[in-house]
Amino acid sequence: MHEHLKEKLAILPDQPGCYLMKDKQGTVIYVGKAKVLKNRVRSYFTGSHDGKTLRLVGEIVDFEYIVTSSNLEALILELNLIKKHDPKYNIQLKDDKTYPFIKITAEKQPRLLITRNVKKDKGKYFGPYPNAQSAHETKKLLDRMYPLRKCSNMPDKVCLYYHMGQCLAPCVKEVTEEQNKEIVDEIIKFLNGGHKEVRSELETKMYEASEKLEFERAKELRDQIAHIDAIMEKQKMIMSDLVDRDVFGYAVDKGWMCVQVFFVRKGKLIERDVSMFPIYDEPEEGFLTFIGQFYENSSHFKPKEIVVPGSIDSELVERFLEVEATQPKRGKKKDLVELANKNAKIALEEKFYLIERDEERTIKAVENLGKRLGIETPHRIEAFDNSNIQGTNPVSAMIAFIDGKPAKKEYRKYKIKTVQGPDDYESMREVVRRRYTRALKENLPLPDLIIIDGGKGHLAAASDILENELGLYIPMAGLVKDDKHKTSHLIIGDPPEPVMLERNSQEFYLLQRIQDEVHRFAITFHRQLHGKSVIQSALDDIPGIGDKRKKILLKHFGSLKKMKEASVTEFVEAGMPKNVAETIYTYLADKKTL
């Protein structure tokens, strides 16, 4: 341990706060919180740790700390510091798992929509639903029962929905605010768990229609009742109080934490969320960090109640999230927490079983690949591929596999700078030169094996740069494809000799993964550049659009297709003046210009 670390550890306060671990570059690699800073920070440098924590500690060369007045303040500060520094060893929940909601818009003539994008607008949101099918089935039923506007833009004449009795035709008739409010209130009542009352009202209307000999109307009402029954049958009631609540459980093993969340809506368990991540703190601290990030995710509404395991400080959760938090001692809520804990434990056990089995196979594949090539075990493999469809936007990509697994933080993209036109060999020479010149200059780790996606010419070009120009002697192999552009075999040596691998072997499978991954990475980069150039060229002739506005539009919309579908308002929201937005809209609407 560095002497200055010992000195800083000796003067740590016994107060709550946050600590920031730094590596040799001064980069914050981990942020944590503690009830007692002195005890928590010192624990990293004493006692035994699992492999993941050892890797973290091995990179720490300095730390800072911030004293707070309470545990709650430390928790809030920790989340802000994680967002600011994005440390590589911290949990960072991805905001990519979104659930569908049913939305009643706040328009003068409101509509029912399904959305995964919950905004802070005046609309009313109901959900989340476990999947799109469930949301669509419910909306379809509501569309049949309640005649709100269906069209996104007001047509000039009544549509089919009006003739089907599913719309009041505000496009041509006056529909008052009171009429809309009455319909919206009925929908809200249904979505808030009042389906039994709605069903009873429909049943009464059905019998009345039958007595009046209005058999078509009675049949429509009967079908609506059947649809309600079908949808509600799929959702098993587990709580009788109809309170919306999220029930949390967790398990910890081998330096990993699994958190399971059960979403209970209107008394029904509709879905669960499973998250697994490495943990470097005490389990309770890791859980609090998780739950803070969980509700920062825009797809996770805070329910009326949050139910947490007995080991968690529910009062702290309640003050932090500003929502009721409970630790059940008995009853159905306690049963649900125990079920969530049990599921978390099972999920971790399955993960470790699969990891152990996969790691054994992967390590064996790397060892066998080295033996077949006659080299030392290639723990670090770097692979290169070029991409230049139709000679435009030539690029190359490098990926790294460490012990048979992709190390995505090590991936690199290259725009070809010195080569004119599509010349694969010269492109390969340029990229190999750039990669390993920098590796030597910055003392970066060198690979045990370099794989070039190509034949003898590509291999010769890369070898020439590596050996004759840079003086590096690293085993290098060419990855040859068959006529279907699939992995065939390797070539290695001078002159290159083929190395045939059994197609059902783990080492062949490893090569396939490397080839697919480097090809995917290269072609994705090429498409990004090509897409940008297509958009920019398409906007070249529009008055008032310079390079700055092109970049703004590209960043906001991402593709020409989305721009063609956008309205004038959406162009204004992207930062365009209204007159420019109208010009862009008119230009893109004219298909002859594109």
Curated annotation (Swiss-Prot):
It is found in: Cytoplasm. Disulfide bonds: none annotated. Gene3D superfamilies: 5' to 3' exonuclease, C-terminal subdomain, GIY-YIG endonuclease, UVR domain, UvrC, RNAse H endonuclease domain. GO terms for biological process: nucleotide-excision repair; SOS response. Residues 14-91 form the GIY-YIG domain. CDD domains: GIY-YIG_UvrC_Cho. Residues 196-231 form the UVR domain. GO terms for cellular component: cytoplasm; excinuclease repair complex. GO terms for molecular function: DNA binding; excinuclease ABC activity. InterPro entries: GIY-YIG_endonuc (IPR000305), GIY-YIG_endonuc_sf (IPR035901), GIY-YIG_UvrC_Cho (IPR047296), RuvA_2-like (IPR010994), UVR_dom (IPR001943), UVR_dom_sf (IPR036876), UvrABC_protein_C (IPR050066), UvrC (IPR004791). Keywords: Cytoplasm, DNA damage, DNA excision, DNA repair, Excision nuclease, SOS response. Belongs to the UvrC family. Interacts with UvrB in an incision complex. PANTHER family: UVRABC SYSTEM PROTEIN C, UVRC/OXIDOREDUCTASE. The UvrABC repair system catalyzes the recognition and processing of DNA lesions. UvrC both incises the 5' and 3' sides of the lesion. The N-terminal half is responsible for the 3' incision and the C-terminal half is responsible for the 5' incision. This is UvrABC system protein C. The lineage of its organism: Bacteria, Bacillati, Bacillota, Bacilli, Bacillales.
